[in-house]
Structures are given as C-alpha cells and as structure tokens.
From Swiss-Prot:
Residues 1-19 form a propeptide. It comes from the Viruses. This is Hexon-associated protein. The record marks 19-20 as: Cleavage. GO terms for molecular function: hexon binding. GO terms for cellular component: viral capsid. Belongs to the adenoviridae pVIII family.
Amino acid sequence: RDAQAEVQMTNAGVQLAGGSALCRHRPQQSIKRLVIRGRGIQLNDESVSSSLGLRPDGVFQIAGCGRSSFTPRQAVLTLESSSSQPRSGGIGTLQFVEEFTPSVYFNPFSGSPGQYPDEFIPNFDAISESVDGYD
C-alpha cells in the first residue's frame, strides 16, 4: 500500500460511501445476525484493503472486483488532473450534453430528426435538416 498516495487522495475528497457488514454468530442462538456498521470508508483508513474496486477512471465495481490496473501513484495523478473546485454559475448546453448525456443513447429524444437539438447529434446537417445515416 502507498499510504502517502492514499492520504493525498483522501484529502482531495475521495471517499467510499456506505458501511461494512459484520456477521456475528452467537452460540446460544441458531440464527446468524447481520450487523451493519454505517460509516464511510476513507482511503487512508488502516482497515481498507487494497482489493477494493476503486479506480480513478470512473469505474467502481461493487461485487467481484479484481485487482486494479492502476498503481496508487497513477490513481493520484489521474484524480488530480480533474478540477477539485466546485463549479459556480451555469454551464452551456454543449458542455451539459458532453458531461451528462449517457453515452449509451445515440439519440436521447424520439421524433423526426428536425426536432432533435443540434447539440445531441454530431452528424446533424442543418441545411438539409437530416441526420447522416438515417432514411
């Protein structure tokens, strides 16, 4: 583990939300009780295993996580490249589309191509009011 990198990431606001489960078996009872301890998991917490599914490329795998291909130093560099300052004011339409439109949806609206906002369709032809590849 790279404790220095984990401290830097924690100080930058990286945190795993949620709690951990603790299963206690009491001999006098025949039922196992599941006790949930609700607290956030900080990266520089000594109880955190390096096998957690935290990756700086935005992928967080909850179940069956394998070993990350990122070293702690690479993770810090990747996370530090993004802005840590909160955004103030509004954002433009194009920036909103780039950041918040799911990439799985090619066209998030239904209807004729003339009704789509131009920002959602990279191959929209404003002159013919058609989308390349559609009949």
